[in-house]
Amino acid sequence: MALRGFCSADGSDPLWDWNVTWNTSNPDFTKCFQNTVLVWVPCFYLWACFPFYFLYLSRHDRGYIQMTPLNKTKTALGFLLWIVCWADLFYSFWERSRGIFLAPVFLVSPTLLGITMLLATFLIQLERRKGVQSSGIMLTFWLVALVCALAILRSKIMTALKEDAQVDLFRDITFYVYFSLLLIQLVLSCFSDRSPLFSETIHDPNPCPESSASFLSRITFWWITGLIVRGYRQPLEGSDLWSLNKEDTSEQVVPVLVKNWKKECAKTRKQPVKVVYSSKDPAQPKESSKVDANEEVEALIVKSPQKEWNPSLFKVLYKTFGPYFLMSFFFKAIHDLMMFSGPQILKLLIKFVNDTKAPDWQGYFYTVLLFVTACLQTLVLHQYFHICFVSGMRIKTAVIGAVYRKALVITNSARKSSTVGEIVNLMSVDAQRFMDLATYINMIWSAPLQVILALYLLWLNLGPSVLAGVAVMVLMVPVNAVMAMKTKTYQVAHMKSKDNRIKLMNEILNGIKVLKLYAWELAFKDKVLAIRQEELKVLKKSAYLSAVGTFTWVCTPFLVALCTFAVYVTIDENNILDAQTAFVSLALFNILRFPLNILPMVISSIVQASVSLKRLRIFLSHEELEPDSIERRPVKDGGGTNSITVRNATFTWARSDPPTLNGITFSIPEGALVAVVGQVGCGKSSLLSALLAEMDKVEGHVAIKGSVAYVPQQAWIQNDSLRENILFGCQLEEPYYRSVIQACALLPDLEILPSGDRTEIGEKGVNLSGGQKQRVSLARAVYSNADIYLFDDPLSAVDAHVGKHIFENVIGPKGMLKNKTRILVTHSMSYLPQVDVIIVMSGGKISEMGSYQELLARDGAFAEFLRTYASTEQEQDAEENGVTGVSGPGKEAKQMENGMLVTDSAGKQLQRQLSSSSSYSGDISRHHNSTAELQKAEAKKEETWKLMEADKAQTGQVKLSVYWDYMKAIGLFISFLSIFLFMCNHVSALASNYWLSLWTDDPIVNGTQEHTKVRLSVYGALGISQGIAVFGYSMAVSIGGILASRCLHVDLLHSILRSPMSFFERTPSGNLVNRFSKELDTVDSMIPEVIKMFMGSLFNVIGACIVILLATPIAAIIIPPLGLIYFFVQRFYVASSRQLKRLESVSRSPVYSHFNETLLGVSVIRAFEEQERFIHQSDLKVDENQKAYYPSIVANRWLAVRLECVGNCIVLFAALFAVISRHSLSAGLVGLSVSYSLQVTTYLNWLVRMSSEMETNIVAVERLKEYSETEKEAPWQIQETAPPSSWPQVGRVEFRNYCLRYREDLDFVLRHINVTINGGEKVGIVGRTGAGKSSLTLGLFRINESAEGEIIIDGINIAKIGLHDLRFKITIIPQDPVLFSGSLRMNLDPFSQYSDEEVWTSLELAHLKDFVSALPDKLDHECAEGGENLSVGQRQLVCLARALLRKTKILVLDEATAAVDLETDDLIQSTIRTQFEDCTVLTIAHRLNTIMDYTRVIVLDKGEIQEYGAPSDLLQQRGLFYSMAKDAGLV
């Protein structure tokens, strides 16, 4: 009543009047309502938002926007609006001054509105100064103000049209001006202003348009339309993608997470924690002590400190991403509340249809209200999803970045506890789990909220009967809980099997050449399949669980409805199930279905994420290296003349292990050259690692002055150009670079390589020989111009003459580094007289130290060692060359000084992993032939320098053949059975709802309905048939998915193992690992679920359309055009979405490849202090991947908003036609039709989402098939031409006019080789780098097939028999000793063909029996990944034991002893001489002394045999062999 006096002088104007506004055919608001509520609502909105918005703007300054015409116009309009409002105010004062009495509202409302317009103008300028290009707050304000003004405008027009109406001319004119200005202001607010000054997007060549998009464009995702149209017209490429928004980049996201994690760890460290480690076996060699990965992880899980002391990764993630993510809470809450508007409006609509007296406009009002709330719901929901997906993306970026950074700093012992496969899984699978969880996590509070609201409204509708439904739901909770627990168990088991499988696949791909040489593919295939079988067992259990889960989720809402309706109609006969009660309840039950369905998924997703969270926490909590354990000083600091000082230091590889190095004390003056010598496993490499801070320092003091460069024993090469490998992040200085290349003997190699130093080097340097790799590694160190150089036996990988060149020009007293401090670990004694200091290691201690002469004079262990090996090798030379041995200590010393090359002619050329099968070694030999060819056009060169094939994205639509392949993999019977059961399920659902509509239309007789029991029974029966069909299709799809998984994996594995070596050389291992991890995971887990959802959505949409057409046939006019719009939107989207998914998959491989590469070279990266550069590279690769992912999630939102608008139109027309036909329709049919139309939005959205998911996920099948159809090598076995089991009996090998090339378009690398090697002969194969030595042996094993000619072994042409028949009958001891993780026995005999006795005999002959006997597990001793818990020498002896076990007639040694010390070399050579006495032995040798007693020697040069004969004959010829022997100091 008080407002009456406020609104009018005489109190005749009420605020609300039902007869004016509702119960009339011509509705209007009262004048009081127009002057108060409609004016105040926009004002209150803006003032309520102002404090929060002001705070937000003050904290988020994006830069300053210059005044633009748009901004000036908006500001001017703001002032005009203020003037217009206050003109009304002054007019009121003027009227009062003339004695006209006015109600207070005419003073209050204009004042409030005027002040609000000033506030709006102030905000327009504040936004400009803070860099806001388009404002949602302001757009909403102008929209609300305009909608309120629209109601007033209609009223004023209606009043003006009345003849006797009183008109207030001045106020009417000001209102029309006010309305026009509001309309213009709203239109202008729809546009975006220019970018702020100094904004980063100004310099970005391809910025994301989102940052400059208008608010309207952002909420409807219109800004991505350009990309989607482009993707529809032509397949999208990487160059089409926009840069990431700055706030989504690794540079912004990762440091925050890392910083918060460190803080959390620091907090935790303050707590008293006791960590227990299991003690390691003391018998393990300590030089590179490794820990079994699985054992360590288990130990960490079981024995990690009490839970409360663990740092909480969840807390850190929340702290990092929570603030942004919290916005999604707000949107989700609004959406959840709006969800219930649909059923309530449906209730009013059914009431309207039943009430024949109600005016028509009410029906149209309900229809519009239904449409508007649905559209608002759509916009709010997709803003919510957008925030969730962006949060998920940021979390994934941050987790990958944190794992990468951690991998660069963890200790070696921690590194061994997580295999490469496990760490890659952390980056791929576990990071993805967090990403997926971000979308669902809100459902934890939202689902219960929805359930409570739905139940409350159901109570209002049905009363206490709803408790029956609640009871059903409560009964389902423990069922879901049990399933969630089981899911977690299976999840852990599945991840464990998967880790083991990826780890084994990694090893297989890294050691594929060895597998092929030994013909071990089948044994390893069986190992992988055994692990896969365990994995599939778990997947099968999960599938059964999933089927039960689907059954309960689908049936629960129906059971709830059935029980509720049954109780409702049976407890009281007067309870009538009319249309309003039934369909509003049904609509609420449909809402209830979503939270009930999603909760188990969310719980399962949380369970999976918790497993991942634990795995990540364990990895991120690993111990880190302590760089502070070594005191580093810059050179200019002075502080003594010593470069390196070590005092009483003890080092260990793992804190839990006994020390590896004990009581080390030495100091090295600046500029000194120091050699470190000693037997295998004595701690030489460990000493260098200790100086690099790679080991844990237990006690003592270590100080290093200046920067460090490191050359590891096994060269680490990046997949990059040769130049970039040498520069390694430094600036190019051409003269210095040239001198480094020359000093490292790389000039001849640059001439040979297709594009010189711009030639791309394959992964792990596959297209370089061992010597070339080592020289590149050396050049990298030299170019870095460091103060201290640590060389781990770099000269063992190169020829004698190259070794001499490098020592003289780089390492030695007159080399480039003569003024630098150099520590050289070496097995070669020829260089020792030239070094300043020799450190002799023994058993992890320094046994002797001094100059060469001092150590000889002491006559200790070093002198004894020299005497032993010098004398034996001099005796050999004496016999070979007819020289009389000289005895006596003095003379012997002299002999050692001058002739020491006898002892080690430096010669290992690390296994030329590709000299044999890459195109480049082909080029190496080919280019030697003709210098003219070196002058080939640069363009031609540039074409050839790319060796590694990047992961390619397919383009265009996924072929139907891919779907057909998948159906065949499932089995056609199961495929069609699934479709049939899906159909049965949906027909039953449709029938049950139609039956319900008939029930609600039953006539009411004496206050009750007849046939209630019959209706209820049929309704229940239809529900049961639906449940059976659901269970059936769920089982069929799950089992089919597992069958397809098994089939596709077996095909892929078999195909990869049957691929030739050339395939592995040009395919980065990251691509292959990606197929076996991510793509296979998609086939295992994603595709069956997507199929279920796709089929469900498809039948739901068809069902909804049928119901709407049955109820209102007039809808046939509108459904086809809407269907057409839907189809076009969907096609537009799928074309781009599919390509974005492919680009995302393709850009993911480099992330893993780079990560793998980093893990292999982590010690080099740390030594050169290049961590920041590698982190930056990794971040760029992750961002490149997210550049494809981000548009794909936005495209999803773009699609959903448009499709839901189509769905909302269906709701609009279904309701509209129901209102138009209300006199001819029953309430039951209206209820059925509108309740189905309310669901059609969701169904349509899901259908396109799932059809797109289907297509994007089926890409995984396409990518698996892509590698299943690669070229294959020859068959492993050919029954028709299989040689006799006793073949070869003699071992006679004939090369007849044999030619070899690596590719069709390349020249021969071996040409016209004609040579016969008789059984039992020992033949040495020698030649300079690139002469074709390894090519010859690889031709023998048919790693490369002959281009012309043939090889005959004991009368059988080897090209005619199966590869395994051939390779089983020849044995090779390769240059790089490769071992696989698994037992020692498995490494010797993977097929378990030999008895334990035979295995022990081979170990005894290989001088390993004592070592293996001392191990606690003997033959079952677990070898680490790559065999790294054995020293190189021990690994080489294991390879010898393999050869002794196979004992074939033909043995090939591929520079097998170059990497080992003299003692091991001696053991191997003597064993070969005695045990393979009656066999044909072919030896590729760089240490010529090892082949001087051979029957004959083949000298190769430029792919041709230059000399062939007995060593003594060739020396007399004084040809190539003689010059090589001379270089080696043998003559």
UniProtKB/Swiss-Prot annotation:
This is Multidrug resistance-associated protein 1. The modification N6-succinyllysine is found at residue 503. Residues 1-33, 96-100, 155-172, 338-363, 462-464, 569-590, 989-1025, 1111, 1225-1226 are extracellular. The keyword Glycoprotein applies. InterPro entries: AAA+_ATPase, ABC1_TM_dom, ABC1_TM_sf, ABC_transporter-like_ATP-bd, ABC_transporter-like_CS, ABC_transporter_C-like, MRP, P-loop_NTPase. One of its GO terms (molecular function) is carboxylic acid transmembrane transporter activity. It is a multi-pass membrane protein. Disulfide bonds: none annotated. Residues 55-74, 122-133, 194-316, 385-440, 486-547, 612-967, 1047-1089, 1133-1203, 1248-1531 are cytoplasmic. Its EC number is 7.6.2.2, 7.6.2.3. It is found in: Cell membrane; Basolateral cell membrane. Belongs to the ABC transporter superfamily. ABCC family. Conjugate transporter (TC 3.A.1.208) subfamily. The gene is ABCC1. It is linked to Deafness, autosomal dominant, 77: A form of non-syndromic deafness characterized by adult onset of bilateral, postlingual, mild-to-severe sensorineural hearing loss. Sensorineural hearing loss results from damage to the neural receptors of the inner ear, the nerve pathways to the brain, or the area of the brain that receives sound information. PANTHER family: ATP-BINDING CASSETTE SUB-FAMILY C (PTHR24223), MULTIDRUG RESISTANCE-ASSOCIATED PROTEIN 1 (PTHR24223:SF241). The modification Phosphotyrosine is found at residue 277. (Microbial infection) Interacts with human cytomegalovirus protein UL138; this interaction mediates MRP1 degradation via the lysosome. The keyword ATP-binding applies. Glycans are attached at residues 19, 23, 1006. GO terms for cellular component: apical plasma membrane; basal plasma membrane; basolateral plasma membrane; extracellular exosome; lateral plasma membrane; membrane; plasma membrane. The chain crosses the membrane at residues 34-54, 75-95, 101-121, 134-154, 173-193, 317-337, 364-384, 441-461, 465-485, 548-568, 591-611, 968-988, 1026-1046, 1090-1110, 1112-1132, 1204-1224, 1227-1247.
